[in-house]
Amino acid sequence: MYYAVSQARVNAVPGTMLRPQRPGDLQLGASLYELVGYRQPPSSSSSSTSSTSSTSSSSTTAPLLPKAAREKPEAPAEPPGPGPGSGAHPGGSARPDAKEEQQQQLRRKINSRERKRMQDLNLAMDALREVILPYSAAHCQGAPGRKLSKIATLLLARNYILLLGSSLQELRRALGEGAGPAAPRLLLAGLPLLAAAPGSVLLAPGAVGPPDALRPAKYLSLALDEPPCGQFALPGGGAGGPGLCTCAVCKFPHLVPASLGLAAVQAQFSK
């Protein structure tokens, strides 16, 4: 019996100890929250013990914000500037422009140099075509206004040089066979064909004399030990028939320039 009465008192203590809520308590709590800075006052259900769990869940889902933070206006967005280093370095914005200008100037120089190189190459090829084309059978057969390509011009020049070399070898052999053991020296100086090799070129076999023996001349100079030009009658031609000369000038008339006559060449031989 005593135990039952004690248990009833223990169960009834929380209900008797709770003070009943008055109407002014809700307004007082709202004014206190306004003074602290929170806009949302606590709900009336938070005062009762039955709605304690619902209030805690609502406070966790919707946190209270200070009044000053909610009423503070947002600051306007600042326009993006040229960069943080633009104030410290006044010429920072001009540096990319100067670098780009330098690159453009370098590109112009490279283009002009390449253009000049191609122009020089075209001029050289045109000069080579002027020398080679008269000896080109393909050009004579083709269209007259058509220009040979660069590779065709170079191949034709190579063949032309090889042909000239073989002709030179044949000339040496002919001079060596026709002159005999006492072969005269045929010296060429200043010819356009052999302009790349300065000095005199020995065509006929024989030792080269001292430098003072080689007289410089603008055109062909011949030093022959043969007698002056003399003709002998062909066999069966009669006394008044045409004669044949055996000197080197008459044998190779194409080596003597047209500006020099036979008398001038013979006068030069006698010196």
From Swiss-Prot:
Residues 38-117 are annotated as: Disordered. It comes from the Eukaryota. It is found in: Nucleus. Promotes formation and maturation of oligodendrocytes, especially within the brain. Cooperates with OLIG2 to establish the pMN domain of the embryonic neural tube. Expressed in the brain, in oligodendrocytes. Strongly expressed in oligodendrogliomas, while expression is weak to moderate in astrocytomas. Expression in glioblastomas is highly variable. One of its GO terms (molecular function) is protein dimerization activity. This is Oligodendrocyte transcription factor 1. GO terms for biological process: axon development; neuron fate commitment; oligodendrocyte development; positive regulation of transcription by RNA polymerase II; sensory organ development. The gene is OLIG1. Residues 43-61 have a biased composition (Low complexity). GO terms for cellular component: chromatin; nucleus. Keywords: Developmental protein, DNA-binding, Nucleus, Transcription, Transcription regulation. Its main location: nucleus. Coiled coil: none annotated. The lineage of its organism: Eukaryota, Metazoa, Chordata, Craniata, Vertebrata. Residues 105-164 form the bHLH domain. The keyword Transcription applies.
